[in-house]
UniProtKB/Swiss-Prot annotation:
Entry's transmembrane regions: none
Quaternary organization: Homodimer.
Annotated Pfam families: Peptidase_Prp
Function: An essential cysteine protease that cleaves the N-terminus from ribosomal protein bL27.
Entry-linked InterPro entries: Peptidase_Prp (IPR007422), Peptidase_Prp_sf (IPR036764)
Protein name: Ribosomal processing cysteine protease Prp
GO terms under biological process: proteolysis; ribosome biogenesis
Record bears the keyword Protease: yes
Keywords attached to this entry: Hydrolase, Protease, Ribosome biogenesis, Thiol protease
One MF term in the entry's GO annotations: cysteine-type peptidase activity
Length: 100
């Protein structure tokens, strides 16, 4: 299962969807496409990106939040949340912002 966690100005993604065998997993491809498609924009706008090579994991964190950066991260979060609602057995989505 892919685990997506959203906290104040931060998104963390980890795990595998296991929707289908390697190379045919459309759920994993969709999540990866959203996140990795946005990475160049995030990296050019001073967002801290951390990857863990030992496990499939990635964190995006707004170092100096601005309205532009918050909007960009919000768009990515909304896309991922939509996928999680469509594939709840393969993607967990935890929004910790409501607890802050």
């Amino acid at each position: 299962m892919i685990k997506l966690t959203v906290s104040h100005h931060k998104l963390t993604a980890s795990g595998h969807a296991l929707f289908a065998k390697k190379g045919q997993d459309i759920v994993c491809a969709a999540v990866s496409g959203i996140i990795f498609g946005a990475l160049p924009w995030f990296e050019t706008n001073s967002i801290a990106v951390q990857e863990d090579a030992t496990v499939p994991s990635l964190s995006l964190e707004l170092v100096q939040p601005t309205a532009k950066l918050i909007t960009g991260l919000s768009v990515v979060i909304m896309q991922l949340k939509t996928l999680a609602h469509s594939y709840p057995q393969f993607i967990s989505f935890e929004d910790q912002r409501k607890d802050e």
